[in-house]
Amino acid sequence: MEISVFGGGAWGRALAFAFGEKNEVKIISRRDLNEPLKKLNDALISKGSAPIEQVDLETGLKASLYVVAISVQHLREWFQNASLPKNAKVLIASKGIEVLNKAFVSEIAKDFIEPNHLCFLAGPSFAAEIIQGLPCALVIHSNNQALALEFANKTPSFIRAYAQQDIIGGEIAGAYKNVIAIAGGVCDGLKLGNSAKASLLSRGLVEMQRFGAFFGGKTETFLGLSGAGDLFLTANSILSRNYRVGLGLAQNKPLEVVLEELGEVAEGVKTTNAIVEIAKKYGIYTPIASELALLLKGKSVLESMNDLIRRA
């Protein structure tokens, strides 16, 4: 089976490596991936698998399955330019909310791909661990369970992929946990202790579920891998970009400096503002996201965390 992965960042390369164990994988990216792919291809070849090949867009569109790992803020433009077939089978691995239109990923994608041909990847995982072949469990959300299982069956031996419905719950959980992860990084950076951190994450999970339920997300999704699992991973590890943003803010660094030092996209920053605006529009109570938005705009980190712990 031939699979095309769109997106040459760390996440896109990790997914190309993962799917490469059982499948012929092409990767499409503007950047030259010759050097980043070398080690991954050596590992694949040692397993008897075919190496990942970087190809142009025209060649990439000839695959049977598509995996999209493009930053959410650029996803709509990417779909417009890529011109995927309307009936393409697509697994979207991007997590976040489009700030410009306050749109969820599924709302963006359905303008370009038949809804029954869409799947969304969720659950706790880091690119750095996937390329090491470390075990993890993920969820593929789709209204088309046959397609979700088709993608699940293409995953490697070290990934346990579950097929579930509840697209909206899965994508909101994946986006919202990045917001809570920033707050988790701040909490640890200020050395507020394990009790405060546990309170923050517990209330953060409740907040995620409350927001998701408004749009039809199911409670069990937020209590499973897509919600609690991804939250507890992302809010507790230095491998998380959003967690590292929180650590930087705890050092009283301006957000611009933190992001410059990070050198990578931390979706939680823009997702925070999108969530707060959506919550205001619909009257959803989101104390952690609301307080974090103030912190990102320059509020004192100590004052912000004190207010957050009291309100959450």
UniProtKB/Swiss-Prot annotation:
It catalyses: sn-glycerol 3-phosphate + NAD(+) = dihydroxyacetone phosphate + NADH + H(+); sn-glycerol 3-phosphate + NADP(+) = dihydroxyacetone phosphate + NADPH + H(+). Pathway: Membrane lipid metabolism; glycerophospholipid metabolism. Gene3D superfamilies: N-(1-d-carboxylethyl)-l-norvaline Dehydrogenase, domain 2, NAD(P)-binding Rossmann-like Domain. Keywords: Cytoplasm, Lipid biosynthesis, Lipid metabolism, NAD, NADP, Nucleotide-binding, Oxidoreductase, Phospholipid biosynthesis, Phospholipid metabolism. The active site is at residue 177. One of its GO terms (biological process) is glycerol-3-phosphate biosynthetic process. One of its GO terms (molecular function) is glycerol-3-phosphate dehydrogenase [NAD(P)+] activity. It is found in: Cytoplasm. Disulfide bonds: none annotated. It comes from the Bacteria. Sn-glycerol 3-phosphate binds at residues 95, 123, 125, 177, 230, 240-242. It is an enzyme of class 1 (oxidoreductase). NADPH binds at residues 11, 30-31, 95, 127, 241, 265, 267. One of its GO terms (cellular component) is cytosol. Its EC number is 1.1.1.94. Its main location: cytoplasm. SUPFAM superfamilies: 6-phosphogluconate dehydrogenase C-terminal domain-like, NAD(P)-binding Rossmann-fold domains. Belongs to the NAD-dependent glycerol-3-phosphate dehydrogenase family. Catalyzes the reduction of the glycolytic intermediate dihydroxyacetone phosphate (DHAP) to sn-glycerol 3-phosphate (G3P), the key precursor for phospholipid synthesis. This is Glycerol-3-phosphate dehydrogenase [NAD(P)+]. It comes from Helicobacter acinonychis (strain Sheeba).
